Regions:
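Condensing-enzyme catalytic core mediating Claisen C-C bond formation in acyl metabolism
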Residues: 4-16, 22-48, 189-259, 268
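Conserved beta-ketoacyl condensing-enzyme motif
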Residues: 9, 33-138, 169-173, 263-281, ...
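Short glycine-aspartate micro-motif
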Residues: 9, 92-94, 161-165, 190, ...
Length: 303
């Protein structure tokens, strides 16, 4: 019988607008608390999720940007929880971010290469003591899930036994004004899949890390395995998704196929749910083909 390597979730950590660790953030989510509020930095936003005042300053590390310091903080906590030596030959680092240190480019006082995503990833890797070159995944809103898929495949291919996946983005004027130019910002808390005419998303900042490992002894209990994933491209346009939903449907089917999981076993969907008309319509189409209509799925969305 062929031995199939399993990929387990190890230690984790997160910083969100709802809390400074995984338990606090999940507890706030379960209680229905909202992390959105008016913010003045880095530019005025009517409803955004920002860290508690002073959090980034408290985590600051010499020689690192606020984002890099937060990534190191979360990665170190995840590593400790997994009882892992990040400096070993069997440990790799995958960094997931959409814009990274883009705020360094404001005012043009910083050399452009300081804002390169790989430059940032190398600084994080050095601080963690990781000897292998880091991998950077930057793929817009699917950066996080793509990084997990990449990390899992690194383990399955025998490149390493453990991967630290760390990701995050901070609020920035560049991102806020970019979405504002598309008229994609909600005037209040976003309402995914809602029929109201005031469509839009709510920006936020968060940083998190998780260890993926082939060693069940390092798995967080109760043990959770990452069984399958898929990435597709709808070949539409950088400013919006294809309205057919085909790309997302193929990704769902690919993930189920890789996991050898029948559709009937699905019990939860964590949808993107941006609150924008084109995206929400596309996702609704992708989740409503004939093969899914018999399922009643609890669904959450994240922006």
């Amino acid at each position: 019988m062929e031995h199939r390597i399993a990929t387990y979730l190890g230690g984790d950590a997160m910083l969100t607008a709802l809390g400074s660790d995984t338990q606090e953030s999940f507890r706030a989510l379960a209680e229905g608390r909202c992390g959105l509020h008016p913010v003045g930095r880095p530019c005025p936003l009517e409803a955004a999720g920002s860290f508690a005042p002073g959090l980034l300053e408290a985590l600051a590390l010499e020689g690192l940007t606020p984002l890099e310091s937060a990534l190191v903080h979360c990665a170190e906590r995840a590593v400790r929880e997994s009882h892992l030596d990040p400096g070993g030959d069997e440990c790799a680092l995958v960094i997931s971010t959409t814009k990274g240190n883009v705020s360094l480019l404001e005012g043009r006082t910083t050399p452009p290469d300081e804002a390169f995503l790989y430059t940032s990833a190398c600084r994080v890797a050095r601080r963690l003591g990781i000897t292998r070159p880091p991998v950077v995944v930057s793929n817009a809103c699917i950066s996080g899930v793509t990084a997990l898929i990449v990390a899992r495949r690194m383990i399955l291919d025998g490149e390493c036994a453990h991967v630290i996946v760390a990701g995050g983005d901070l609020l920035s004027e560049f991102v806020a004004e970019g979405f504002r130019s598309f008229k994609s910002l909600s005037p209040g808390p976003c309402r995914p899949y809602d029929a109201t005419p005031e469509h839009g998303l709510s920006l936020g900042e968060a940083v998190a890390a998780v260890v993926l490992t082939s060693d069940p002894a390092r798995a967080k209990l109760p043990a959770v395995r990452l069984e399958g994933g898929a990435v597709t491209d709808d070949a539409n346009h950088i400013s919006g998704p294809s309205r057919t939903g085909d790309g997302l449907h193929y990704a769902i089917e690919g993930a189920l196929r890789e996991a050898a999981l029948p559709r009937e076993r699905l019990s939860f969907v964590n949808a993107h749910g941006t609150g924008t008309a084109y995206n929400d319509a596309m996702e609704s189409r992708a989740l409503e083909p004939v093969s899914y209509t018999h399922l009643t799925l609890p669904t959450t969305s994240r922006v």
